[in-house]
Amino acid sequence: MKGMADLYTGEDEMWRIIDMGEEHDGAASNSVCYAIKPDHYNGTHPEEYSKTWINLNTSLTEELGVQHSALSTLYPPQGFIGWHNNANASAYNIIFTWSEHGEGWFKYVDPKTQEVITIQDEKGWNLKAGHFGIYGSGDVVYHSAKTDCYRMTLSYTLGHDEDYWKDCIDFITS
């Protein structure tokens, strides 16, 4: 798995996806992770799991006033999501990430400078916020993530209201 993570989150793959231009549909095509929404759960006690998940998701969406959970994923050690840009789901977003030991990262290409930025996970909960643009907008954000420990991501989209997005960030961080 580690070789796959390095391959699909590496520089060669980044350039391959970027060079595809609009031929890339925006979604990640390579990952090692597990969807954690109830409709993907195959474990014991599915009713209890579903109820717990719905309560958590409802609490977050009501508290933040958001409507859409874009991604809810658990990455195992050596898990990853390969380079992609979410041009198929353009919106302001808030991304909560929990990391078991802080041995993961989120990388993105700054759409203005083309610099590759790495945000190292810290142990526990982390918050990232950004905007994933559509093709032609000047703010398409290519990104990937990788971890060597358990890592969970809960991502919510907020539409295209920048002021509301900023208010949410202020609320969460105050």
Where are these predicted regions, by residue range?
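Non-heme Fe(II)/2-oxoglutarate
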Residues: 1-64
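Ligand-binding loop in jelly-roll beta-barrel domains
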Residues: 136-153
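Catalytic core of non-heme Fe(II) oxygenases with the double-stranded beta-helix
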Residues: 66-139
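Nucleic-acid-interacting cores, centered on viral/eukaryotic replication and modification enzymes
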Residues: 81-83, 150-154, 158
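Exposed regions on extracellular, virion, or secretory-pathway luminal proteins
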Residues: 8-12, 25, 113-124, 146-148
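Low-complexity intrinsically disordered segments
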Residues: 159-164, 168-174
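Short, charged, solvent-exposed linker or helix-capping segments at domain edges/interfaces
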Residues: 54, 63, 105-109, 165-169
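Secondary-structure boundary elements
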Residues: 58-65, 99-103, 161-163
